[in-house]
């Protein structure tokens, strides 16, 4: 994994609502504001590490590839499919972002990439006329090494996601210049894992805010997450649900991410985890 060092720090839990769904998935509607009373009562020791180095976006280290996408026409993703594939090089410490109509599978080939699985992929969706960005991270599953460090991988991905989102906005800058309203789109982050504890979905709010660093240098402790009782499903309108039939307000008609989508199935079924 492209982690430089691991440190230990005392990290307070964040205020959040958690909702368990079927297929061993957890939906977390997270807030970045901290409960001062809770912070005084308990603290958690959790590992911290870096996936892409310091959590500071450096445009000079980002290489952008437009594959089958006309960079100058900056067509709206609500009319033409648009995805992001972001990978990291341990050798050069550079990020490579592919902007295309589907996930750039060639970017994910090779034994090293398959071993590390530190890529981040994302797609734009229009659901009932509202745009949202769906970001996917692979935490564990596939081989035992990832399972052994699933917790560490979860913290790393979550810590570095603001950098990833900034890379999307910077790399696809012409699109956002032409359609600045996309920065108000809701960001949904999917953490894929064979371990229920880390198999979860988080709502990060508007892209403009999600790309900003947290108020404090922290990550969400899983122990704190498990403390909050899962009492109800997301309220109507929170989870982006497609229209049941063919329509013009939902696009694309199917997901462009070739990963399991048990999170979406669970939310659509509206069934809490047993």
UniProtKB/Swiss-Prot annotation:
**Would the keyword Plastid turn up in this protein's UniProt record?**
yes
Name where it mostly resides: plastid
Keyword Plastid in the entry? The reply is: yes
Keyword terms of this UniProt record? Chloroplast, Plastid, Transit peptide
Kindly give the PANTHER family that the UniProt entry links to this protein: LP06106P, PROTEIN STAY-GREEN 1, CHLOROPLASTIC-RELATED
> Could you say which protein family the record assigns here?
Belongs to the staygreen family.
Name recorded for this polypeptide? Protein STAY-GREEN, chloroplastic
- What does the UniProt entry say about where the protein is found? Plastid, Chloroplast
The annotated transit peptide is positioned at 1-48
- Membrane-traversing stretches: none
InterPro entries this protein is in?
Staygreen (IPR024438)
Question: What's the stated role of this polypeptide?
Answer: Involved in the disassembling mechanism of the intact light-harvesting complex of photosystem II (LHCPII) in the thylakoid membranes. Required to trigger chlorophyll degradation during natural and dark-induced leaf senescence.
Alphabetical GO CC annotations of the entry are: chloroplast
Q: Which GO terms describe its biological process?
A: chlorophyll catabolic process
């Amino acid at each position: 994994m492209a982690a430089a060092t691991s440190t230990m720090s005392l990290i307070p839990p964040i205020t959040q609502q958690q909702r368990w769904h079927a297929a061993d998935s957890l939906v977390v509607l997270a807030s970045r504001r901290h409960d001062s009373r809770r912070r005084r009562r308990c603290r958690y020791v959790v590992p911290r590490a870096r996936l892409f180095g310091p959590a500071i976006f450096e445009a000079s280290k980002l290489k952008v590839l437009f594959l089958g996408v006309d960079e100058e026409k900056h067509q709206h993703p609500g009319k033409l499919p648009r995805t992001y594939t972001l990978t990291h090089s341990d050798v050069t410490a550079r990020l490579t972002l592919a902007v295309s109509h589907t996930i750039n599978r060639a970017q994910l080939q090779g034994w090293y990439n398959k071993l590390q699985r530190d890529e981040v992929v994302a797609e734009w969706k229009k659901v009932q006329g509202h745009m949202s960005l769906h970001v996917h991270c692979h935490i564990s599953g596939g081989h035992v090494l990832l399972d052994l460090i699933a917790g560490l991988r979860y913290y790393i991905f979550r810590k570095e996601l603001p950098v990833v989102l900034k890379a999307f906005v910077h790399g696809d800058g012409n699109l956002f210049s032409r359609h600045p309203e996309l920065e108000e789109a809701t960001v949904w982050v999917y953490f894929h894992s064979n371990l229920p504890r880390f198999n979860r979905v988080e709502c990060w709010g508007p892209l403009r805010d999600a790309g900003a660093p947290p108020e404090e240098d922290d990550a969400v402790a899983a122990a704190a997450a498990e403390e909050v009782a899962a009492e109800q499903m997301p309220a109507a309108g929170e989870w982006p649900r497609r229209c049941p039939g063919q329509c013009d307000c939902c696009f694309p008609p199917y997901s462009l991410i070739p990963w399991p989508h048990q999170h979406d199935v669970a939310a659509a079924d509206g069934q809490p985890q047993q």
